[in-house]
Regions:
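Conserved AMP-binding/adenylate-forming core of the ANL superfamily
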Residues: 56-57, 74-129, 146-151, 207-217, ...
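Conserved pre-ATP/AMP-binding loop-to-beta segment of ANL
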Residues: 70-72, 195-198, 208-240, 247, ...
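Structural core segment of the AMP-binding/adenylate-forming
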Residues: 129, 133-217, 328, 336
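AMP-binding/adenylate-forming catalytic core of the ANL superfamily
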Residues: 141-166, 181, 325, 332, ...
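AMP-binding/adenylate-forming catalytic domain of the ANL superfamily
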Residues: 193-199, 566-591, 603-633
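Conserved AMP-binding/adenylation subdomain of ANL enzymes
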Residues: 259-277, 287-331, 344-350
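Gly/Ser/Thr-rich phosphate-binding loop
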Residues: 302, 330-334, 343-410, 424, ...
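Conserved ATP/PPi-binding loop(s) of AMP-dependent carboxylate-activating enzymes
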Residues: 418-422, 433-468, 507, 604-605
Length: 634
């Protein structure tokens, strides 16, 4: 099939209002918009101004009204509790309406903020949709976040109510949430009126009299709430970016542009249709969970999977394949980190052969840069297209992708292909000139961005402009560095901060990681720039070997140094690599390169609130000391 990508992309830039007006016809509107794009106050653009709709209605009630109420809407699969539960659209709508009614009974109204601090349980999805139903603005905070980080979000969002749970459950441990919540509520200057607690049998919590309510008691007897008509430009949610310092940045998502963009993405980018099954193996605390566990699949009339488990360890590296086979997943979206973990434990893909994956047709990777070796390994063993794509919390959906629904373009490993409709992506120099093909620059998006992207930060227009708009006037700064090739394919090499200067040569650590990950013994890797008296900076590699590798570290490191020298050149100055057991990551799978760099350079650092296991930093420190770095660390 000839790809319709070029036609769609060209029209979206030439006639954005006509293009998006056509796309928006797929969404149910209580009242049509007055203007597709209100550009009267740049850089603050508003999509579908004057339009009225309800996101929850479009995600649930619309499908019931069209005769699909008995279709599976949500499948909860929890290997950590040995639970599988399925909700039809009828059942999910009824649960959502009842919780929405309980919120209304508590006095929660349109525009009020509600923080959701919960694990991966159906009640978390129900809570998000219940807020959307009545126009309350939800702010989901990753379950288990430290008290001080949760307190910052409470003070910024100023919620009237918090929906939470007694505990979260990991592979081998129960994480009590209630003490963290209590600590945050005590720390916060803003005083929360009510906390509603879902009691999980694995770790019940004591309730604070006069403030806390049991979830079941809260919902009991509540009259179901109908959907509230909302302006397209009204906020749907606020999601705070992870790993921030000081006051966190609250990314705002509107109702209208969000619904239009996400429903479009399900068909155009992911090639999904109503009645099919989509699985985003992420967490609702991250943007992937918001967009592709909750909103986009349901807006598109798909079945969505809510997975409370891990890629390995619940119980083995075949966990993903069991879920795909058991629930008939057609397309999956996860982070490359998950596949590196699977590849490390099951390098020959033996577990894949034990499950019927005949209905599975596409794998999508995003969340961090995908090295070609991981992509090719997944493609070789799964025998389906493996599509790397690129986007951010701020955009809420893909900036660049190989759009399956428009007809795939040829895959180039290492590239997320080309910009998606509506995104006018440029590669810019420091002085705002476009870079020639093949040369690395700062990746920026010409304003206005398409529907679904952040209109601003929560109560922080000045921070919005400073963070994203000042560096390249007229453009949104992605913070990523990369280049375009001769065919117009984008390559995202690293964060702008990860470009290192070795004796005056600007080099991408991402390019070096690509070379290291291609070594047959390497499961995953990271490269950071460390201070050097002579060259200013030099690259330092960290590598984790695959399961079963028994060769000496010295031999492997020598080969890695030779690979960099051959494929990038002596100019890279790559002379040191450390073999470690594991790399420090956030809970969403992003490698903490900046923290490793600060440890190596003996600088002060604070472990990010999003870190998965702080103990790994001690292991990294010991490895660095053994190589002569981190000299001033205790």
């Amino acid at each position: 099939m000839r790809s319709r990508y070029d036609e769609a992309y060209t029209r979206s830039l030439r006639d954005p209002e006509g293009f998006w007006a056509g796309v928006a016809e797929d969404v149910y509107w209580e009242r049509r918009w007055d203007r597709v794009l209100d550009d009267g106050r740049p850089p603050y653009y508003r999509w579908f101004a004057g339009g009225v709709l309800n996101t929850c209605y479009n995600a649930l009630d619309l499908h019931i009204d069209r005769g699909r109420g008995k279709q599976r809407a949500l499948v909860y699969d929890s290997p950590v509790t040995d639970t599988i539960k399925t909700f039809t659209f009828f059942e999910l709508r009824d649960e959502v309406a009842r919780l929405a009614g309980a919120l209304r009974r508590q006095g929660i109204d349109k525009g009020d903020r509600v923080i959701i601090y919960m694990p991966m349980v159906p009640e978390a999805v129900i809570a998000m949709l219940a807020c959307a139903r009545i126009g309350a603005v939800h702010s989901v905070v990753f379950g288990g976040f430290a008290s001080n980080e949760l307190a910052k979000r409470i003070d910024d969002a100023r919620p009237r109510l918090i929906l939470s749970a007694s505990c979260g459950i990991e592979v081998n441990r129960v994480i009590p949430y209630k003490p963290l919540l209590d600590g945050a509520v005590d720390m916060a200057a803003h005083k929360v009126e009510r906390c509603v607690i879902l009691q999980r049998p694995q770790g019940p919590a004591a309730l604070v009299k006069g403030r806390d309510l049991d979830w079941n008691d809260f919902v009991s007897g509540a009259a179901p709430a109908e959907c509230v008509p909302l302006a397209a430009t009204d906020p749907l949610y606020v999601l705070y970016t992870s790993g921030t310092t000081g006051i966190p940045k609250g990314v705002v998502r509107d109702n209208g542009g969000h619904a239009v963009a996400l429903k479009y993405s399900m068909s155009a980018v992911y090639g999904m249709g109503a009645g099919e099954c989509f699985w985003a193996a992420s967490d609702i605390g991250w943007v992937v969970g918001h967009s592709y566990i909750v909103y986009a699949p349901l807006l598109a009339g798909c079945t969505t999977i809510l997975y409370e488990g891990k890629p390995v360890g619940t119980p083995d590296p075949g966990a993903f394949w069991r879920v795909i086979a058991q629930h008939g997943v057609n397309a999956m979206f996860t982070a490359p980190t998950a596949f590196r973990a699977i590849k490390k434990e099951d390098p020959k893909g033996v577990h894949m052969t034990r499950h019927d994956l005949s209905r599975f047709r596409t794998l999508f990777l995003a969340g961090e840069r995908c090295d070609p070796d991981t992509l090719l390994w997944a493609r070789e063993h799964l025998h389906v297209p493996v599509i790397d794509h690129w986007w951010q919390t701020e955009t809420g959906w893909a900036i660049a992708a190989n759009c399956v629904g428009l007809g795939m373009l040829p895959v180039k490993p290492g590239s997320p292909t080309k910009a998606v409709a509506g995104y006018d992506v440029r590669v810019l120099s420091e002085d705002n000139q476009e870079m020639p093909a093949g040369q690395i620059g700062s990746i920026a998006i010409k304003l206005p961005m398409p529907p679904g992207c952040l209109p601003t930060l929560w109560n922080n227009d000045a921070g919005f402009e400073k963070s994203y708009l000042v560096k390249h006037p007229g453009f949104y700064l992605t913070g990523d560095a990369g280049y375009r090739d001769e065919d117009g394919y984008l390559y995202i090499m690293s964060r702008v901060d990860d470009i290192i200067n070795v004796a005056g040569h600007r080099l991408s650590t991402g390019a070096m990681e690509e070379v290291l990950s291609g070594h047959p013994d390497i499961a995953e890797c990271a490269v950071v720039g460390v201070a050097d008296e002579i060259k200013g900076e030099v690259p330092l590699g960290f590598v984790v070997t695959k399961a079963g590798v028994s060769r000496s570290d010295g031999d492997i490191v020598k080969e890695l140094i030779d690979r960099i020298r051959q494929q990038i050149g002596p100019v890279a100055g790559f002379k040191t690599a450390l073999v470690v057991k594991r790399l420090p990551k956030t809970r969403s799978g992003k490698i903490l390169r900046g923290t490793m760099k600060r440890i190596a350079d003996s600088q002060e650092y604070t472990a990010p609130a999003t870190i998965d296991d702080p103990g790994i930093l001690d292991e990294i420190t010991d490895a660095l000391k053994g190589a002569g770095y981190a000299k001033d660390r205790p």
